[in-house]
């Protein structure tokens, strides 16, 4: 019943992982389903991850999306990690989605 969850009809939130760019891969998120033991882990070198639960669709809360990205509105904020793409420099970032079955302990 949190105000932001009601207003957005679920999650539509950007979570900051780091405050400056580096090649370091960080765990952005993990999802676990205890009945089957399925687990998904998201690793990235990008500075943020967006969590979205599709609240505006016909059947809200039937999906979840984890999008690695730069901070929202980055070009308007000089203190945010730069998302500028230049023709002389290759754009290289990495996001890894790994899946496993984890038995309960």
Which residues are covered by each model-predicted region?
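Active-site pocket scaffolds in enzymes
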Residues: 1-105
């Amino acid at each position: 019943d949190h105000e932001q969850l009601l207003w957005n009809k679920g999650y539509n939130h950007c979570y900051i992982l780091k405050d400056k760019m580096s090649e370091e891969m960080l765990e952005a998120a993990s999802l676990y389903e205890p009945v089957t033991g399925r687990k998904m882990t998201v690793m990235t070198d990008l500075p943020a991850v967006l969590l979205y639960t599709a609240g505006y669709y016909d059947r809200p809360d039937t999906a979840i999306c984890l999008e690695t990205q730069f901070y929202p509105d980055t070009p308007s904020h000089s203190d945010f990690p730069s998302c500028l793409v230049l023709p002389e420099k290759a754009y290289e970032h990495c996001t890894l989605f790994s899946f496993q079955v984890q038995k309960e302990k």
